[in-house]
UniProtKB/Swiss-Prot annotation:
NAD(+) binds at A18, T22, F29, R30, Q96, V98, D99, H114, S181, S182, N206, I225. Belongs to the sirtuin family. Class U subfamily. CDD domains: SIR2_Af2. This is NAD-dependent protein deacetylase. It is an enzyme of class 2 (transferase). It comes from Oceanobacillus iheyensis (strain DSM 14371 / CIP 107618 / JCM 11309 / KCTC 3954 / HTE831).
C-alpha cells in the first residue's frame, strides 16, 4: 500500500528524527549524558548561556559529540532515501538531526531544522569552518573568536528559512512520512500536521507512540526504519 502511495505521490516529504540516527549506532542527544557527562543535563550544556559563560565545558561536550558522529555513518535507510530522491520519488527531506548522514548518503534536498555538527562557525565574525577543527583541537577563529558547531542551541532563534521551507513543503505534500521522531518538539512537530491538513497521506514510523498517531493514515512501530524502507523497495 505504501509503495503505491509513494509511486502515486507528486510530492513526497520525509521527516526524520533521532530514531533515524540511532539506527546508525549514534546515541541520541538525550543519551549523551553518559561517562563524563553523566551528572550533567545535556540541554543545559547545549545552550547559548554555557557557550557564553563556560566555554571550556561547552567545547569539551561538543568535541565529544563531533567525534561520536565521525565514528558512525549512514545506514541502509539513508541510502534508500537518497536512491528514491534520484528516482524522483522523494522531493524533500526535513530533519531534526544534526549528524549530516542524509547528505553523506547522497541526498541533496535536505532541510536541517536544528543545524549541523559537520560545520563550525566563529561566534564573533561568522566565518565557517569544518568540524575537523574540533577533532584537531582547534577552537578559535583567525580573528580570535570561539568556534562553535553550526547547530541551534537552547536559547537561540530557530532558523526561519529552514522552517519556512519545511512548512511550504508540507503544504505541497501528497505523502508525508515521519521516520523516527517522537513529534514532541515544537514547532517542528507542527509540520506533519500541516501536511495532513492540506490533504497529504501521513505515515508515522516510530518505536513509541506519538501525539499525532491519531491523525496518521498508517503507523508502524514494529519495524526498524531501515527494514521498513527496504521492505517498500523490495515490494513488487
Amino acid at each position: 500500500m505504501i509503495k503505491d502511495w509513494l509511486q502515486e505521490s507528486n510530492y513526497t516529504v520525509i521527516f526524520t528524527g533521532a530514531g533515524m540516527s540511532t539506527e546508525s549506532g549514534l546515541p541520541d542527544f538525550r543519551s549523551a549524558n553518559t561517562g563524563l557527562w553523566k551528572q550533567h543535563d545535556p540541554s543545559k550544556i547545549a545552550s547559548i548561556d554555557t557557550l557564553n559563560n563556560n566555554v571550556e565545558t561547552f567545547i569539551d561536550f561538543y568535541r565529544e559529540r563531533v567525534l561520536k558522529v565521525k565514528e558512525y555513518g549512514p545506514h541502509q535507510g539513508h541510502y534508500i532515501l537518497a536512491e528514491w530522491e534520484k528516482q524522483g520519488l522523494v522531493h524533500s527531506i526535513v530533519t531534526q538531526n544534526v549528524d549530516g548522514f542524509h547528505q553523506a548518503s547522497g541526498s541533496k534536498i535536505v532541510h536541517e531544522l536544528h543545524g549541523t555538527l559537520q560545520k563550525l562557525h566563529c561566534q564573533s565574525c561568522g566565518k565557517e569552518y569544518s568540524s575537523k577543527e574540533y577533532v584537531e583541537n582547534e577552537y578559535h577563529c583567525d580573528c580570535g573568536g570561539v568556534l562553535r558547531p553550526s547547530i541551534i542551541l537552547f536559547g537561540e532563534m530557530l532558523p526561519q528559512e529552514a522552517f519556512q521551507t519545511a512548512f511550504n513543503d508540507a503544504e505541497k505534500a501528497d505523502l508525508f512520512v515521519v521516520l523516527g521522531s517522537s513529534l514532541t518538539v515544537s514547532p517542528a512537530n507542527q509540520i506533519p500536521l500541516i501536511a495532513k491538513e492540506n490533504g497529504a497521506k501521513l505515515v508515522i514510523v516510530n518505536q513509541d507512540p506519538t501525539p499525532y498517531d491519531q491523525y496518521a493514515d498508517m503507523t508502524i512501530s514494529d519495524q526498524k526504519i531501515g527494514e521498513f524502507l527496504r521492505s517498500i523497495s523490495n515490494e513488487g
